[in-house]
Amino acid sequence: MTRSPSRQMSLVGFMQAGGSTVYSGSWRHPATEHRFLEQGYYQHLGRVLEAGCFDMMFFDDRLAMPGIYGGSVGPAVELGARPVKLDLSVVLGLIAGVTRSIGLGATYSTTYYSPFHVARTFATLDHLTGGRAAWNVVTSVNDSEAQNCGLATHLDHDARYDRADEFLEATVGLWDTWEDDALVLDRESGRFADPSKVHELDYDGRWFKVRGPLTVPRTPQGRPVLLQAGSSGRGRDFAARWAELIFTGDPGIEVARAHYKDQKDRIAEQGRDPATVKMLPMAYTVLGESRSQAEELERMLLDDLVDPTASLVLLSELMNHDFSGMGLDEPVTDELIESVSGIRGLVQNLRAHIGHDLTLGDLAGHRATLLQGPRFVGTGEEVADQMEEWFSGDACDGFVIAATHSPGAYEEVVRLLVPVLQRRGLFRDRYDGSTLRENLGLPRP
């Protein structure tokens, strides 16, 4: 797969609306600001990333505190293992008011919401941001979420994706119920809209029956941008059908290259152009004014800030499996992977990176020591070298940058790394488009 010399990478900020980033020790970092319950905190993050010309910032979400480990939320609450998760529609509205160009994405579950609710939420966001909305499609991961939404247990892995396919069919159908020129707004004739250009959907599936039409007209982007992060075989097929930006968790470049090729092939098999779908691995950047400073910061992240129990709390949440009674030296077998209903692909990718023999301690270390994606360490020039190797080596189309602390990690990326990427012609120095789709180079449906 050859690349144009003028091709530039995409950069996306991976955000959390709570007290910790995805790195569970981040709240203990000496530079972390504990202002996650203040609107100014999120608005500042939006301004920082927009100043760095990031394509988008999107927020992860879950519908429950981590409570699988030991059958209690106590460890998550005590150790700060992501117990706080604010309502993202409110957070994005606050950021939208102080930014003009950066894309704004939120995570909504196809298992615990309805198509009409999600379609209306993101259509509204797309209008009120001038075409900057994106939906990160997830199927949710565990029983704790089910129990907050009126169910006893979470759907099994494949059933969640069957439901998600119908959810997307209905949601996309609702976005298409208004034609682009349906609004007339003719004061003289008294004609608000053309009823021949507003259509009922009448979706009738196994999981959903949705009449429509949507109560929000066609949006500036036509449809909000769709993100997805499935990495199991079923998840990759789902992404091949629906996703426009695929968020991956590949820990090493060889795993990433294999994933990139496999996913692009699946996209082509769906009759879609692989060039219109971007694959972005989550990456941590540990930046310093010198290599030695960056390595000392990395040592602190690896050795000082993460409680091993917090890692097991988050691992239990992701896998929907209580690991509190297992020893760290116990093997992670094929049978164990098949028995869980949570995120299987994450474990499979890590096993491919480390080797077939994988223990629970390896997985706990994976969550604790920042191995969910690549970890780029060094000066701005050195980190740019590492990112360029991935980007030019058929491993990705850009990166989703996760923070080791906030907001400082993003401030450092914008100050130390982005100018290097811009000088090399690898990243934009201004926004040329007026919508998120235009800035990502994606077609308007």
Q: Model-predicted segments: where are they?
A:
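N-terminal glycine-rich cofactor-binding segment that shapes the pocket for flavin-like pterin cofactors
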Residues: 1-445
